Regions:
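Conserved core of the sugar-phosphate nucleotidyltransferase
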Residues: 105-189, 220-265
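Short phosphate-binding loop-to-helix
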Residues: 51-121
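Short, conserved phosphate/pyrophosphate- and ester-handling motifs at nucleotide-, phospho-/glycolipid
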Residues: 195
Length: 265
């Protein structure tokens, strides 16, 4: 079984309530769920939110829309994933696909490509963020359930508990890790939703493309942005991996290590 787990919460320090912001009369979370469900390989989808009362909106919305939702620890997101694994009765040989709710432009075809690469290479962990070539916001991680369980058992650093797969990436000697790369380096593009400027950009994209094709493609986004470079520059002042960098600093990560993170996604 291949299960997508979408982590979502309301208490974002940089853009509060971002997962419920409106995009063409539907909240961001709905679009992330809908686009992820359009994957041909994913068989089940569960939203993983925090137990904090601020996330009651997410729980109520998921119930209303018949979306499976599990609540767990606010900061120990790895434990939240493990709780979903138990809830969904995920077996050791099953596959977990990690998606975050700040990616309303997530590409279902790309999700399938990463899953296929994971299976063909017999990998423990496969991601398109290890050597970034895709726009920030098309992030997809595919993990063997038994490996995610080991990470839950062994991860000790706060950053490894908050950033679910960091323990795996920190221990390439223990796991078969595969990087999925695109044919063109588009890693300088920012399509994630963390700042007000990100929302302005993504809203423009939806207003332009959604009415003609509700499952608009990465190519359509690129064509639109290439038609007017000023649009893509709306959020260009923000950098990749700001949240991860903050967590690593709190764990005492060196400047040299931080440079590696920002280089390798």
């Amino acid at each position: 079984m291949i299960v997508a787990i979408i982590q979502a919460r309301m208490d974002s320090s940089r853009l509060p309530n971002k997962v419920m912001l409106d995009l063409c009369n539907e909240p961001v979370l709905w679009h992330v769920v809908n686009r992820t469900r359009s994957s041909k390989r994913i068989e089940r989808l569960v939203v993983a939110t925090s137990e904090n009362s601020s996330n009651d909106t997410i729980r109520e919305y998921c119930k209303q829309k018949d979306i499976e939702c599990v609540s767990g620890n606010e900061n120990d997101v790895l434990d939240r994933y493990y709780k979903v694994m138990n809830y969904a009765n995920i077996k050791d040989d099953d596959i977990v696909v990690r998606i975050t709710a700040d990616c309303p432009l997530i590409d279902p075809e790309l999700i399938d490509e990463v899953i296929e690469h994971h299976i063909v290479t017999n990998s423990d962990y496969t991601s398109n963020t290890i050597e970034p070539t895709f726009p920030d916001g098309l992030d997809c991680e595919v993990i063997q359930a038994t490996v995610l369980k080991k990470a839950w058992e062994e991860a000790k650093l706060k950053s490894e508990r908050e950033h679910v797969t960091l323990y795996i990436r920190n221990h390439p000697e223990l796991f078969r890790i595969e990087s999925y790369r695109g044919n063109e380096d588009l890693s300088g593009m920012r399509w994630t939703l963390d700042e007000e400027e990100d929302y302005i950009l993504i809203k423009r994209i939806y207003e332009e493309l959604y009415s003609n094709n509700k499952m608009f493609t990465t190519k359509e986004i690129l064509d639109f942005l290439n038609s007017d470079p000023n649009i893509g520059a709306i959020n260009s002042m923000h950098t990749r991996n700001q949240g991860l960098t903050k967590s690593l600093k709190e764990d005492g990560c060196t400047e040299e290590d931080l440079k590696k993170v920002n280089k390798n996604g």
